Amino acid sequence: MKNKLILAFSGNDIFSGGGLHADLATYTVNGLHGFVAVTCLTTMTDKGFEVIPVEEEVFAQQLASLKDVPFSAIKIGLLPNLEIAEHALAFVKQHADIPVVLDPVLVCKENHDLEVSALREEIIKFFPHVSIITPNLAEAQLLTQKEIKSLEDMQAAAKELYDLGAKHVVIKGGNRLSKERAVDVYYDGQDFEIMESPVLASNNTGAGCTFASSIASQLLLGKSPLAAVQFSKDFVYRAIQRSDQYGVVQYEK
């Protein structure tokens, strides 16, 4: 039987709605022992929301500290720069026998074109080494360099990401295509699965982190990729229903 040790590469959300807080809460409600290698800190200042990467050496030391822990799954969240991403990829390559879920968080950097371009290329290098990728619609556009305006566009983007090396792809459409229905597209190289749920007006901060962490948890616990995705979509829906002013809530209040 697999152990229940699961790792996240993620940032510290100062308001605890997303990032490592969402990851660890999701792991806990799934009965797993969660670990985190912190990639960045965040602050809210007069200038707005800021992401502060940890020093490259500090991140490398975190990974070195974890080298002998027998993880059964990994979830990858916000990788704030190329250096952090390179260390994360090297670590993932050393764990080729376990499920790895990549949430390619690029949107917070969309105003820094040169940095995003380099990071995009590095993130694509992860694709052959992970079990599933979970970009939202904006991230899928950045990764494919194509605009997505319809369900057919989402399907074409999922196929393109698969062709770039991803084994399983979920594109989270959210409410960008419809204000009433949240539409996600799953693709495994053969078949598409269209998943819909009502759009909620509640705070959805941390929903993407929770979704990816839930998928990683369910893969560890033995579900197939599609079953893990379907379970996790429902899990996130309920977490959004329970959300407070800081973000989604993974546990029963």
Please state what every model-predicted region is.
Residues 1-3, 8, 19, 179-194:
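Acidic-glycine-rich active-site phosphate/pyrophosphate-binding loop
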Residues 116-191:
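Conserved phosphate/ATP/ADP-binding segment of small-molecule kinases
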Residues 141-142, 201-225:
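Short, small-residue alpha-helix embedded
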Residues 31-33, 192-193, 218-232:
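Phosphate-handling active-site elements
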Residues 10-15, 192-205:
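Short pre-catalytic strand/loop immediately N-terminal to key active-site residues, enriched for Gly-Thr
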Residues 53, 226-253:
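Charged C-terminal helix
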